[in-house]
From Swiss-Prot:
Organism: Streptomyces rimosus
Name used for this protein in its record: N,N-dimethyltransferase OxyT
Keywords linked to the UniProt accession: Antibiotic biosynthesis, Methyltransferase, S-adenosyl-L-methionine, Transferase
Positions of disulphide bridges: none
GO MF term list: O-methyltransferase activity; protein dimerization activity
SUPFAM superfamilies: S-adenosyl-L-methionine-dependent methyltransferases, Winged helix' DNA-binding domain
Phenotype upon loss of function: Cells lacking this gene are unable to produce the tetracycline intermediate anhydrotetracycline (ATC).
Protein encoded by which gene: oxyT
A single BP term in Gene Ontology: methylation
Length: 344
């Protein structure tokens, strides 16, 4: 089967759309930064009302709102604007699957990192200009409580959808407890626990996150079933559990530390215990443009180029003494792979 080549003008138009794709991203970023979707959550407003309540003074305010209509983020009814169903569901603060946290992270950090891509490629340094990258960056992120809260909102965006997939795809019936290593403030752990009432969960992450984790655990009424442990998972004792979950943690570390962590998890688990790993993993048979760009993004943010294939993950997990029981792609925001392995 052959495909008809695009006419020159169509090819040129496609390239033009690509080079101006940031127009769409920045329109969304600014709308969230301004609090537009929160403003319209309770009802529609005119352009003048929006300008007044959000203190917008630029004469292009109406064109900005019309652009959001064209992007299907707003809907227009006469001279009034309201949130589209998607914006109401995902871009209003407090929504159960709020995406605004990651939109703000992309607006305030990732966008600027990508602006330095050329320099990063030529000079060999990560484009973020951060003081630290990889695992060393996280303690610095969490020194300031407000910054830590912003980072948690970014992480929550992804872990909300991942939790749904893990709750559905992993057979939890044979386990009574689990611990999420590097589980941030516990968004994934609490969601999995809510989906499976027989489970008791725990989160192991840096001590600075304890207040935010406690806040979320109380908010979801799980004080008796989910707990937080602060510490260093490479040196401190790991709490006992029937299963260990870890996601987007292993690539932060060089191979020796990764192997050390997997060995420590294996040692901590009982016979029959499960290791549940989810992460961006390369797979030639299913790779998409989104996958490749996400790996590039993660490398720029983390300051390295680490990306492992499904087979490399499987090999490291088996080398640690586990037997892989399940490996499949899951339907979360990043299109992660899920590997479930058992300690014999």
């Amino acid at each position: 089967m052959t495909t008809t080549p695009l006419a020159p003008v169509a090819q040129a138009r496609s390239l033009l759309q690509l080079t101006t794709a940031y127009h769409q991203a920045k329109a969304l970023h600014s709308a969230v930064e301004l609090g537009l979707f929160d403003l319209l959550a309770d009802g529609p407003a005119t352009a003048e009302e929006v300008k007044d309540r959000l203190r917008i003074v630029h004469p292009l305010a109406k064109e900005f709102l019309d652009a959001l209509v064209a992007l299907e983020l707003l809907e227009a009814d006469g001279d009034r604007y309201r949130n589209s169903p998607a914006a109401q569901a995902f871009l209003v603060s407090g929504a159960s699957e709020y995406l605004g946290g990651t939109v703000l992270q992309h607006a305030r950090k990732h966008y600027h990192v990508w602006a330095g891509l050329t320099t990063a490629l030529q000079e060999g340094e990560a484009g973020s200009g951060a003081e630290a990258h990889g695992p060393e960056a996280y303690p610095k992120h969490y020194e300031d409580p407000e910054r830590a809260r912003q980072v948690m909102a970014h992480f929550d965006t992804f872990s909300s959808f991942t939790a749904e997939e893990l709750a559905r795809r992993v057979d939890w019936s044979g386990y009574g407890s689990f611990i999420d290593i590097g589980g941030a403030r516990g968004n994934l752990a609490t969601r999995v626990a809510l989906a499976h009432p027989h489970l008791h969960g725990a989160v192991f992450d840096l001590p600075a996150l304890a207040p935010l984790a406690g806040e979320l655990i109380r908010e979801r009424g799980l004080e008796g079933r989910v707990r937080f442990h602060g510490g260093d998972f490479l040196t401190d004792p790991l709490p006992s559990a029937d299963a260990v979950v870890t996601g987007h943690v292993l690539p932060d570390w060089p191979v020796p530390q990764r192997r050390k962590l997997l060995a420590r998890i294996h040692e901590a688990l009982p016979s029959g215990g499960a290791l549940v790993v989810y992460d961006l993993m390369t797979d030639p048979a299913t790779t998409t443009v989104h996958d490749v760009l996400q790996r590039l993004n993660h490398g720029l943010i983390r300051g390295d180029s680490s990306s492992s294939s499904v087979e490399e993950y499987r090999a490291e997990i088996e080398e640690a003494g586990f037997r892989v029981r399940q490996a499949e792609r899951i339907d979360n925001l990043l299109g992660d792979w899920l590997i479930v392995a058992v300690k014999p």
